[in-house]
Amino acid sequence: MPEHAPDGVRPARPHHKLTADGRRMREVLTYSRRGSRFSPRQQQAWAAYAERWWVPDEAVDDPGFTLAGCFERSAPLIVEIGSGIGESTVALAAARPDHDVVAIEVWRPGVADTLGRIGAAGLSNVRLLSVDAVWSMAHLVEPDSLAALWTFFPDPWHKAKHHKRRLVTASFARLVAGRLAPGAEWRLATDWADYADQMVEVLDAEPMLEGGVVERWAERPVTKFERKGIAAGRAITDLAYRRRGAAR
């Protein structure tokens, strides 16, 4: 069962971790926190919807926090890592009203945009967290429970010296495989060829998963990041990996 870290540690936010003597702990993160200034439209969306659909970091740090407790019902759970401005989140969640969707995004203007999209679409099955995705998968998601995981256009960390910060690694693949329900899918997309190659190498090597490169997922809308990649001349790669075992 997932467990929170001991009292006094802010586990969901590695950039806040301290050593025993109070010094800031250096962590290898899979994300970077970009600017947090809101546009007037984003500020309006945040004011209107954040209290309803965004889970504060301090709430996630509470030892009694659960993802199920974020919703007013019991439903199959989907997690999206790196939801950006919510284009995929809202479209895919709207098509799955019987599922609950937790979108993890640390960029607050993107969260605000997503909140606005949720409100405009009239959805009630999406919640947003702005905490570390790797920690969240390990400590908030129950084993064998996820109905699906979506990871579209994760930060490519394209410089070789930064590859260690990429999200899709062997250890993360093993973690995800153990959190997916049997038969559940992990959908990924990237516009960086070398990251796509790394994803295939890592995920093919995980014995609990099966899959590979697939045709573009028709349900996934063309997002801002995808358009940017196409404009730069980069090919888009979609991948789908399934947790081995009979679907429930």
Swiss-Prot record:
<feature type="binding site">
    <location>
        <position position="155"/>
    </location>
    <ligand>
        <name>S-adenosyl-L-methionine</name>
    </ligand>
</feature>
<protein>
    <recommendedName>
        <fullName>tRNA (guanine-N(7)-)-methyltransferase</fullName>
        <ecNumber>2.1.1.33</ecNumber>
    </recommendedName>
</protein>
<dbReference type="InterPro" id="IPR029063">
    <property type="entry name" value="SAM-dependent_MTases_sf"/>
</dbReference>
<keyword id="KW-0489">Methyltransferase</keyword>
<keyword id="KW-0808">Transferase</keyword>
<feature type="active site">
    <location>
        <position position="155"/>
    </location>
</feature>
<keyword id="KW-0949">S-adenosyl-L-methionine</keyword>
<feature type="binding site">
    <location>
        <position position="132"/>
    </location>
    <ligand>
        <name>S-adenosyl-L-methionine</name>
    </ligand>
</feature>
<dbReference type="GO" id="GO:0043527">
    <property type="term" value="C:tRNA methyltransferase complex"/>
</dbReference>
<feature type="binding site">
    <location>
        <begin position="223"/>
        <end position="226"/>
    </location>
    <ligand>
        <name>substrate</name>
    </ligand>
</feature>
<dbReference type="Pfam" id="PF02390">
    <property type="entry name" value="Methyltransf_4"/>
</dbReference>
<comment type="function">
    <text>Catalyzes the formation of N(7)-methylguanine at position 46 (m7G46) in tRNA.</text>
</comment>
<feature type="binding site">
    <location>
        <position position="159"/>
    </location>
    <ligand>
        <name>substrate</name>
    </ligand>
</feature>
<feature type="binding site">
    <location>
        <position position="191"/>
    </location>
    <ligand>
        <name>substrate</name>
    </ligand>
</feature>
<feature type="binding site">
    <location>
        <position position="105"/>
    </location>
    <ligand>
        <name>S-adenosyl-L-methionine</name>
    </ligand>
</feature>
<dbReference type="InterPro" id="IPR055361">
    <property type="entry name" value="tRNA_methyltr_TrmB_bact"/>
</dbReference>
<dbReference type="InterPro" id="IPR003358">
    <property type="entry name" value="tRNA_(Gua-N-7)_MeTrfase_Trmb"/>
</dbReference>
<comment type="similarity">
    <text>Belongs to the class I-like SAM-binding methyltransferase superfamily. TrmB family.</text>
</comment>
<feature type="binding site">
    <location>
        <position position="80"/>
    </location>
    <ligand>
        <name>S-adenosyl-L-methionine</name>
    </ligand>
</feature>
<comment type="pathway">
    <text>tRNA modification; N(7)-methylguanine-tRNA biosynthesis.</text>
</comment>
<keyword id="KW-0819">tRNA processing</keyword>
<dbReference type="GO" id="GO:0008176">
    <property type="term" value="F:tRNA (guanine(46)-N7)-methyltransferase activity"/>
</dbReference>
